[in-house]
Curated annotation (Swiss-Prot):
ATP binds at V18, G60, V61, G62, K63, T64, E65, D256, E321, R393. ATPase subunit of a proteasome-like degradation complex; this subunit has chaperone activity. The binding of ATP and its subsequent hydrolysis by HslU are essential for unfolding of protein substrates subsequently hydrolyzed by HslV. HslU recognizes the N-terminal part of its protein substrates and unfolds these before they are guided to HslV for hydrolysis. Keywords: ATP-binding, Chaperone, Cytoplasm, Nucleotide-binding, Stress response. This is ATP-dependent protease ATPase subunit HslU. One of its GO terms (cellular component) is HslUV protease complex.
């Protein structure tokens, strides 16, 4: 669980997302409250429930990006789902309980990686011994079993030194490695994924773990052996217990496109499952117990963050019970020309930085001038206003169109410097931007 303060979390998010300070503050406080709750006495800790968040804002302003970055900062079980993928029980589609099952699977994977990392030093020692056993087989007694000697031989110690110094990395050896289990593909109807997973696990267990001889270089063998030995040191039952505890105490679920499951008054019949999805979500958000293949998981203290554009609906179109379980509301502002300029320059992996790096691989030096960036931002904003407002995603379309000629002829521009200034942008984009019909279909 991350111990970063809200201010540190916001500062970290600022490196990737421009503006939207209120949304960043809300998720930062919610994440910090997870840590604060764990410092309380157990009796009071159980009573403190997470304050779920509803993020409201037009498409392309950073709602999903905040979730992606939060997942990396949280160091906790995290899953992002699309509300449109789910239907109520009885309809074709995934049931909402699969959210918690997927979250638990993610937690098991996360805890397993942490356990392997903790056991890495011991695993490296065991892997080293297995490689040395191949290079210098131990002496055997009359019954064909390895003799137990107190001190390793000088030859073994010499090879150990060479192995650690990397002198034997390119030497090939034949060693027994765990064979990958035979995959069993099972075609199941939508909504039956859990049964499919259980059947695949059953077949995998029936097959057992087999050893297969492979001839590979020592450097690669060490990597594979370390992973194999580290996996053996992990206790599966203890791993499941830790994963379930991590989900129950620190789990975060991000539900995107929640506005798409709002019931619309003018639509009936085909719209019937929308409200059903909301009602199925209620127990999860309020707190219930979900059965997973790893065990029973309580959702009482899982943090839910929902987001939606709400362009053809409003948050009040959600059923009242679900509205009440999303008490913190954050509105994200539409992006301005100034925001577009900042998006093109401020983030650590901004679009301009990406294009400069991509063209550098062909030996082409690209520079973006201030007036060029300003004109790109104005063009993106203008197209958004005239056609459909898709927020910052419009910059991808505009820049790709702008860089098309350079990308196509990059090999011929090797060793040259190209400056993307206002005149260059005018020449390549003005005709498209000024013609609304062309903008609609090309940009």
């Amino acid at each position: 669980m991350s111990e970063m303060t809200p201010r540190e979390i916001v500062s970290e998010l600022d490196g990737y997302i421009v503006g939207q300070h209120n949304a960043k503050r809300a998720v930062a406080i919610a994440l910090r409250n997870r840590w604060r709750r764990m410092q309380l006495d157990e009796a009071l800790r159980h009573e403190v429930t997470p304050k779920n968040i509803l993020m409201i804002g037009p498409t392309g302003v950073g709602k999903t990006e905040i979730a992606r970055r939060l997942a990396k900062l949280a160091n906790a079980p995290f899953i992002k789902v699309e509300a449109t993928k789910f239907t109520e029980v009885g309809y074709v589609g995934k049931e909402v309980d699969s959210i918690i099952r997927d979250l638990t699977d993610a937690a098991v994977k996360m805890v397993r990686l942490q356990s392997i990392e903790q056991n890495r030093f011991r695993a490296e020692e065991l892997a080293e011994e297995r490689v040395l056993d191949v290079l210098i087989p131990p002496a055997k007694n009359n019954w064909g079993q390895p003799e137990e000697s107190g001190e390793p031989s000088s030859a073994r110690q010499n090879f150990r030194k060479k192995l650690r110094e990397g002198q034997l990395d390119e030497k090939e050896i034949e060693i027994n490695l765990a064979a990958a289990p035979m995959g069993v593909e099972i075609m199941a109807p939508p909504g039956m994924e859990e049964m499919t997973n259980q059947l695949q696990s059953m077949f995998k267990n029936l097959a057992g773990q087999k050893q297969k001889p492979r001839k590979i270089k020592i450097k690669e063998a060490m990597k594979l052996l370390v992973e194999e030995e580290a996996a053996k040191l992990v206790n599966p039952e203890e791993l499941k217990e830790k994963a379930i505890e991590a989900v129950e105490q620190h789990g975060i679920v991000f539900i995107d496109e929640i506005d798409k499951i709002c019931k619309r008054d003018e639509v009936s019949g085909l719209d019937v499952s929308r409200e059903g999805v909301q009602r199925d979500l209620l127990p999860l958000v309020e707190g219930c117990t979900v059965s997973t293949k790893h065990g029973m998981v309580k959702t009482d203290h899982i943090l839910f963050i929902a987001s939606g554009a709400f362009q053809v609906s409003s948050p009040s179109d959600l059923i009242p019970e679900l509205q009440g379980r999303l008490p913190i509301r954050v509105e994200l502002e539409a992006l301005t020309t100034e925001d577009f300029e900042r998006i093109l320059t401020e983030p650590s992996a901004s679009l301009t930085t990406q294009y400069i790096a991509l063209m550098a691989t062909e030996g082409v030096s690209i520079t973006f001038t201030e007036d060029g960036i300003k004109r790109i931002a104005e063009a993106a904003w203008q197209v958004n206003e005239c056609t459909e407002n898709i927020g910052a995603r419009r910059l991808h379309t505009v820049l790709e169109r702008l860089m098309e000629d350079i990308s196509y002829d990059a090999s011929e521009w090797n060793g040259k410097t190209i400056s993307i200034d206002a005149d260059y942008v005018h020449g390549h984009l003005d005709e498209l931007v000024s013609d609304e019909d062309l903008s609609r279909f090309i940009l």
